[in-house]
């Protein structure tokens, strides 16, 4: 398909297909069994489709929206064969994941005055620092002069892990000692980025949701300080979520969205889980674009998200 040649190499499509294998088994194969041999879509078929969507962590609200859209189409067309039904599901699901201006066709930065600033948030254990390391690699491969800021200062391990990623990717890391003021680290990082003529600064921040008020105040301070160094920074606030936690990822996303303005999402650890349907629910419920998905452990396996490619992989197209 010309579509895939535009967004993916064959290797990337294979990686995506492999990464979504368990979710595809959970969604596509169950739906296929539900509609096999049926010339009409009755309540039993709709119930089985609903169950398949819910068990793959699409979420109740989004599942209801999908089923209602199907019911409306079935009522209008009266008779719908298996392929027509699958095509309609594909269209509905793809539509729920599309957001205006949310799609990047490549790892290419928007043009800004000075360095482009990407602030990354997320709780411990979701793959936040790993995502930053993989992003640094991808952007460096594109020729962007990148710097990382270790502003998750509440865990020594977070600083150390980012330093390791910096060494692995050949990207400098600005850091202070554990317990330092995160805003101070962000300030130093952006000053370094400006002085070195960097194209991109990625700031790792803490994500301690147990006290939302403190988190809100901390992130607000970081943002204010960055804006003083580079007006308009951060240009992007990326929330990293663990896709293998299913609906818990959606709850986390809602909590973070209440604490600070989130402009995009990265959903990690989709390989090895049958809960990849949560990407559909998150895209629909939050109205925040998913920009990146993690579909493997390799450094290249953080992919740009594309709704049509994701749905095509789920539906084995």
Regions found by a protein language model. Name each.
Residues 206-208:
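Short glycine-rich anion-binding loops that position phosphate/pyrophosphate groups of nucleotides
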Residues 3, 105-106, 135, 251-253, ...:
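Short beta-alpha junctions and helix-cap segments that line functional grooves
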Residues 121-122, 204, 240, 294:
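Short beta-strand segments
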Residues 1-17:
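Disorder-to-helix initiation segments
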Residues 17-151, 158-178, 186-203:
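Primarily NTPase-proximal linker/entry elements flanking Walker-type ATP/GTP-binding cores
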Residues 60-62, 155, 271, 299:
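Short hydrophobic/aromatic residue motifs in ordered secondary structure
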Residues 152-153, 243:
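Residue-level signal for short, function-critical loop segments
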Residues 161, 178-196, 210-316:
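Conserved catalytic-core segment of NTP-binding enzymes
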């Amino acid at each position: 398909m010309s579509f895939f040649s535009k967004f993916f190499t064959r290797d990337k499509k294979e990686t995506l297909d492999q990464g979504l294998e368990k979710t595809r088994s959970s969604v596509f194969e169950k739906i296929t069994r539900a509609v096999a041999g049926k010339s009409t879509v009755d309540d039993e078929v709709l119930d089985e489709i609903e169950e398949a969507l819910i068990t793959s962590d699409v979420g109740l609200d989004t599942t209801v929206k999908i089923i209602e859209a199907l019911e409306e189409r079935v009522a209008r067309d009266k008779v719908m064969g298996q392929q027509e039904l699958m095509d309609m599901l594909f269209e509905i699901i793809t539509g729920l994941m599309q957001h205006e201006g949310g799609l990047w066709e490549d790892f290419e930065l928007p043009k800004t005055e000075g360095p482009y600033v990407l602030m990354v948030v997320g709780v411990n254990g979701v793959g936040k620092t790993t995502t930053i390391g993989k992003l640094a690699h991808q952007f460096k491969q594109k020729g962007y002069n990148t710097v990382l800021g270790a502003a998750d200062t509440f865990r020594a391990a977070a600083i150390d892990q980012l330093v390791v990623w910096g060494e692995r990717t050949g990207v400098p890391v600005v850091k202070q000692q554990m317990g330092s003021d995160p805003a101070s680290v962000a300030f130093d990082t952006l000053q370094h980025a400006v002085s070195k003529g960097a194209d991109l600064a990625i700031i790792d921040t803490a994500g301690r949701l147990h006290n939302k008020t403190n988190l809100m105040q901390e992130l607000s301070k970081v943002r204010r300080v960055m804006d003083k160094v580079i007006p308009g920074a951060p240009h992007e606030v990326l929330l990293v979520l663990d896709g293998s936690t299913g609906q818990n990822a959606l709850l986390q996303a809602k909590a973070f969205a209440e604490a600070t303005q989130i402009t995009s999402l990265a959903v990690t650890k989709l390989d090895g889980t049958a809960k990849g349907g949560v990407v559909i629910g998150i895209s629909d419920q939050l109205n925040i674009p998913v920009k990146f998905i993690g579909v493997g452990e390799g450094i290249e396996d953080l992919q740009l998200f594309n709704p049509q490619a994701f749905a095509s992989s789920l539906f084995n197209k």
